[in-house]
Amino acid sequence: MKQLMMSDVTPEEIFNQRRQIIKSMGLGIATLGLPNIAFAEENVSELKALTFKAASKSDLALTPENKIIGYNNFYEFGTDKAAPAKFAKDFKTDPWQLEISGEVENPFVLNHQQLFNTFPLEERIYRFRCVEAWSMVVPWIGFELARLVEMAKPSSKAKYVVFHTLYDPEQMPGQKNPLFGGSIDYPYVEALTIEEAMNSLTLLSVGLYGKMLPPQNGAPIRLVMPWKYGFKSIKSIVKISFSETRPKTTWESLAPTEYGFYANVNPNVDHPRWSQGSERVIGAGGLLSVKRQPTLMFNGYEDQVAHLYKDLDLKVNF
């Protein structure tokens, strides 16, 4: 199997931009690998602890907290894995408003406090699989998206649930500088079918490791769908709308032959530039202890979600 390089798992234009940024900073290309995440630990203790129902016992080995908060894709804060922790540390998430609108009987707005107290919070230990063929295990805290959907009371026209990330170029340097933010047409947009949104695995997360989400992980609220590639799990959400028509999502618009609408984890459907048959596990060890493991269909959640796609050709609808 081909050994993946950073240029393999990143769209070519964005990788070349990243090289240019790193070079202008006087850093070596080796910086593009697993980052030095010591700086990510500085703010861990400052995050507010949450009250939640603990997860049931899991056999999954958790990825250490400092790696979860120090190795991220959040292009609004830069395309390098270490950039979000560095450039999001002063990101202001309070005050915040999450607008619920569209084809619903009950549109509403949640403020920052209401994100944490409107619905009972619970812990979910989920596998997290990036489309770049690396994975983690994360102890998320949040509530089922289905609870919010039920409160909104979608009409019979609502076929899709559409999410928008905050657009704030003054706080998000990747939105202000196309070179720094991967030339994405912001704000970041994602969407699900209404059936996917109602699945009990679909989580709106407000925390991890017992505390509020760090900014680089999508504070104050993000989507988590453990059977899909990570780019579907949109961060720092300010708007959720219900639509009759399917929108073009951000990565689908950028590279439709590489990043599909459904983005289900599927070891039998390779990315055009690399295999999805296995993944690099980011665990407790250092660089020399990083291991590869076979990728599971739907990331190991086949029993819970396969029925959603029984009438789809997953090689076409990837």
From Swiss-Prot:
Residues 1-40 form the signal peptide. Mo-molybdopterin binds at N72, Y75, E76, C130, T165, N217, R222, S233, I234, K235. The keyword Transcription does not apply. It is an enzyme of class 1 (oxidoreductase). Predicted to be exported by the Tat system. The position of the signal peptide cleavage has not been experimentally proven. Its EC number is 1.8.5.-. It is found in: Periplasm. Its cofactor is Mo-molybdopterin. It holds the Pfam family Oxidored_molyb. GO terms for cellular component: periplasmic space. GO terms for biological process: protein repair. It catalyses: L-methionyl-[protein] + a quinone + H2O = L-methionyl-(S)-S-oxide-[protein] + a quinol; L-methionyl-[protein] + a quinone + H2O = L-methionyl-(R)-S-oxide-[protein] + a quinol. Keywords: Metal-binding, Molybdenum, Oxidoreductase, Periplasm, Signal. Binds 1 Mo-molybdopterin (Mo-MPT) cofactor per subunit. Its main location: periplasm. HAMAP family: MsrP. Heterodimer of a catalytic subunit (MsrP) and a heme-binding subunit (MsrQ). Part of the MsrPQ system that repairs oxidized periplasmic proteins containing methionine sulfoxide residues (Met-O), using respiratory chain electrons. Thus protects these proteins from oxidative-stress damage caused by reactive species of oxygen and chlorine generated by the host defense mechanisms. MsrPQ is essential for the maintenance of envelope integrity under bleach stress, rescuing a wide series of structurally unrelated periplasmic proteins from methionine oxidation. Belongs to the MsrP family. This is Protein-methionine-sulfoxide reductase catalytic subunit MsrP. The gene is msrP.
